[in-house]
């Protein structure tokens, strides 16, 4: 079984749920304290053993490429002003992983975005991390899913339980307990008008 070393981060959405904040700034670049959301996601993937990352973008999101690239003028100024610690952080961004980008020319949904990664992933197993879904923890969520894949050899999805009231906003999986926090699920999705389960995708 091949090791999961690649990750796909769909980040081509319009960010309509967080307007007006995302009108001029991609939602993936909105800061959480001192880092943009997407940096947390890339760092999570790297901590889980991912070495190659494809970020799927669209027009108006080149700021993400700039964020993970070198910035010689800024780096020079930081060194000249004695800010070595900040300099190291800025330089490290360009070396977190092998990050490439592809543009989704039409915003046609998540499935289409992931299909744009076909040439990148080839026949290898890969992780999908949402560009605006930050999960913080000592043990990276992506790493937990990779371990589950390594144990089962099957596709793995991370889910969370939500309240009965919130379930209307999600699609749901029918799950059966397996062990610990692991569940098996059927391939059929429960229609959104049938809120009988509280484990959304």
Predicted segments, located by residue:
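Well-ordered alpha-helical segments embedded in enzymatic catalytic cores
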Residues: 37-40, 112-116, 187
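N-terminal glycine-rich phosphate-binding loop and ensuing alpha1 helix
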Residues: 2-83, 140-143, 191-192
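Mobile, glycine-enriched helix-loop/loop "lid" segments at the mouths of ligand-binding/catalytic clefts
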Residues: 77-78, 174-188
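Short loop/turn motifs at secondary-structure junctions
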Residues: 3, 49-51, 122, 151, ...
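Conserved beta-loop-beta/alpha segment of the NTase-like Rossmann-fold superfamily
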Residues: 73-76, 84-177
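Conserved alpha/beta core of the MobA/IspD/sugar-nucleotide pyrophosphorylase nucleotidyltransferase superfamily
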Residues: 2-4, 180-184, 197-198
């Amino acid at each position: 079984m091949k090791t999961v070393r690649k990750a796909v981060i769909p980040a081509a959405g319009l960010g309509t749920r967080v307007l007006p904040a995302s009108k001029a700034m991609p939602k993936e670049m909105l800061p959480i304290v001192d880092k943009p959301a997407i940096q947390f996601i890339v760092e999570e993937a790297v901590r889980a053993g991912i070495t190659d990352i494809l970020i799927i973008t669209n027009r108006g999101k080149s700021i993400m490429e700039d964020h993970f690239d070198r910035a010689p003028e800024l780096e020079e100024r930081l060194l000249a002003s004695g800010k070595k610690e900040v300099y190291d952080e800025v330089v490290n961004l360009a070396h977190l992983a092998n990050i490439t980008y592809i543009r989704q020319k039409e915003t046609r949904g998540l499935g289409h975005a992931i299909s744009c990664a076909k040439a990148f992933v080839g026949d290898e197993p890969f992780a999908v991390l949402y560009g605006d879904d930050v999960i913080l923890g000592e043990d990276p969520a992506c790493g937990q899913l990779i371990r589950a894949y390594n144990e089962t050899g099957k596709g793995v999805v991370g889910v969370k339980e939500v309240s009965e009231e919130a379930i209307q906003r999600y699609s749901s999986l029918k799950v059966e307990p397996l062990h610990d926090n692991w569940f098996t699920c059927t391939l059929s999705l429960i229609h959104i008008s049938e809120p009988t389960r509280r484990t959304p995708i």
